[in-house]
Amino acid sequence: MKKCLFLIFVLALGSGLAAQKQLSDVFEKGDVVWFGLDFSQAKFVQILNEQGSETEIVEKWIPAWNNLMVSEPGKYDFAKTFKKEQVIYAIETAARVNEQMVPEGLLVSSCPDMEAPEALVADLIKAYDTGSVTEGLGLVFVVTCFNKGTVQGSMYITFFDIASREVLLCEKMTGRAAGFGIRNYWAGSIYDVLKQIQKKDFKRWRSKYLSK
């Protein structure tokens, strides 16, 4: 009986270890869970007209940008960008984070540089409520700035192991905004980032991380 119990324990432990994702899984085919656009650290420069408000950003535009990623998967193609077989959408995680944002102070004259951004992103991931998604490879974009003055959106592309919340890859990217209307214009910066990654950066990251 003791031998049986020990065998069950070993098998369960082995199964748990196998479920955890490693850095190499970022570059392998398979599934990825898209947790959305995390705006909890974001600042905005001149993105609204005179009638716009910071509350509008939190209540209207941030949900609109997240929903667009889901409603137009052919354009915002995470599977093609990151060479994955399937994308599982779980943007409720980012929605819960974004709903806690305080509107005051979001509109600024210039976006400040983040101190120790990788450590900050790691702390954000640790606190995520991923709901029923308990394992697998997670992906989130932590947006830091939408800047009309520079016509750019900046964000940290972040892969993590869902089971342990360990960050596997965190890379800063900047995309050029383009399009008509506030929603499409700033979503254009995300689209530009995806195209950059498809063209060269995913291959560059593979060489950077897997050659160590």
Q: Whereabouts are the PLM-identified features?
A:
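Compositionally biased, low-complexity repeat tracts
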Residues: 10-12, 26, 70, 134
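Active-site nucleophile-His-acid catalytic modules used for acyl/amide transfer and hydrolysis
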Residues: 143
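C-terminal/domain-edge helix-coil "capping" segments
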Residues: 20-49, 111-134, 146-212
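Surface-exposed, polar helix/loop patches in the mature regions of secreted/periplasmic/lumenal proteins
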Residues: 84-136, 140
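Residues in well-ordered beta-strands of folded domains
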Residues: 7, 35, 140
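A structural "domain/chain start" motif
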Residues: 19-108, 210-212
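Bacterial Sec-dependent N-terminal signal peptides
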Residues: 1-24
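Generic surface-pattern signal
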Residues: 6, 70, 74, 83-87, ...
